[in-house]
């Protein structure tokens, strides 16, 4: 009988030791997922929330003109990065290369370092698997006495790289949205639609969701 009791105690201790690590792993896995939500990363589309963009802005540091961008792909198409064109400002990260449907890309931008009176303004382009281009424009000015935050999304027929011409089209001609702390939406054509939000401050957040129309 005593042998059975000892065996039972040993088995119980072994099982307890095996079970203990599980309690420690779960928080670590959550921390790992959170750490992936940085500019230049691709995350699950459902994880694109404002708090993610807040962390990107915090990581940029003490820069008075900066932007955190998140674009969710629910288009049913895969996206492949082509390029970013900066009219002013820059980014220290690479535009995420491949964004499958169901995922979201994270990106950022900031004014040029140093005592220069510039904002962060630009456009980036993605080739979609249907042969067309998705373009996203953002404009965070230096002087809010003269300018405001603006953003835009547009699909172009065929493959079109981001450049000055694309920026001018999206900023001046293609009905851009003002960064007014509100949500806006539109039909993009090619079976797609979008909704997005941009705030009005110099630490800008741009959240966009592209989906089937």
From Swiss-Prot:
Leader sequence segment: 1-19
Entry keywords, A to Z: Cleavage on pair of basic residues, Cytolysis, Ion transport, Membrane, Nematocyst, Secreted, Signal, Target cell membrane, Target membrane, Toxin, Transmembrane, Transport
Pfam family, one: Anemone_cytotox
Comment field on protein domains: Composed of a long N-terminal alpha-helix and a core region rich in beta-sheet structures. Before the pore formation, the alpha-helix binds the lipid membrane, partitions into the lipid-water interface and stabilizes the monomeric molecule on the membrane. Finally, it traverses the bilayer, thus forming the transmembrane pore.
CC terms in the record's Gene Ontology section: extracellular region; nematocyst; other organism cell membrane; pore complex
Gene3D superfamilies per UniProt: Cytolysin/lectin (2.60.270.20)
Principal location: secreted
Oligomeric form and interacting partners: Octamer or nonamer in membranes. Monomer in the soluble state.
UniProt family annotation: Belongs to the actinoporin family. Sea anemone subfamily.
Compartment(s) where it occurs, according to its Swiss-Prot or TrEMBL record: Secreted; Nematocyst; Target cell membrane
SUPFAM superfamilies reported for this sequence: Cytolysin/lectin (SSF63724)
GO MF term list: channel activity; toxin activity
Location of the region described as Plays an important role in the hemolytic activity in the Swiss-Prot/TrEMBL record: 37-46
Residues the record marks as site: Important in the initial contact with the lipid membrane: 147
Trp-rich region, which is important for the binding to lipid membrane: annotated segments: 139-154
Stretches for region N-terminal region: 45-64
Described function: Pore-forming protein that forms cation-selective hydrophilic pores of around 1 nm and causes cytolysis. Pore formation is a multi-step process that involves specific recognition of membrane sphingomyelin (but neither cholesterol nor phosphatidylcholine) using aromatic rich region and adjacent phosphocholine (POC) binding site, firm binding to the membrane (mainly driven by hydrophobic interactions) accompanied by the transfer of the N-terminal region to the lipid-water interface and finally pore formation after oligomerization of monomers.
Protein name as annotated: DELTA-actitoxin-Aas1a
Propiece residues: 20-34
Example of a GO biological process term: pore complex assembly
InterPro entries named in the record: Actinoporin_PFT, Anemon_actinoporin-like, Cytolysin/lectin
Domain of life: Eukaryota
């Amino acid at each position: 009988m005593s042998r059975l009791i000892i065996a039972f105690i040993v088995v119980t201790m072994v099982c307890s030791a095996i079970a203990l690590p599980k309690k420690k792993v779960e928080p670590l896995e959550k921390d790992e997922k959170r750490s992936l939500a940085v500019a230049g990363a691709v995350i699950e589309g459902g994880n694109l929330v404002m708090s993610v963009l807040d962390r990107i802005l915090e990581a940029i540091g003490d820069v008075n003109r900066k932007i955190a961008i998140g674009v969710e792909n629910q288009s049913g198409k895969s996206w492949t990065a082509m390029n970013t064109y900066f009219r002013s400002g820059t980014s220290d990260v690479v535009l995420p290369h491949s964004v499958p449907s169901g995922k979201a890309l994270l990106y950022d931008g900031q004014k040029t370092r140093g005592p220069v009176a510039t904002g962060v303004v630009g456009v980036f382009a993605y080739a979609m698997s249907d042969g067309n281009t998705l373009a996203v424009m953002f404009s965070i000015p230096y002087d809010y006495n003269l300018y405001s935050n603006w953003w835009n999304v547009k699909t172009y027929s065929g493959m079109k790289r981001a450049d000055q011409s694309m920026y001018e089209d999206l900023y001046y001609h293609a009905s851009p949205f003002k960064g007014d702390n509100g949500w806006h939406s539109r039909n993009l054509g090619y079976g797609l639609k979008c909704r997005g939000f941009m705030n009005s401050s110099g630490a800008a957040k741009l959240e966009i969701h592209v989906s089937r129309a």
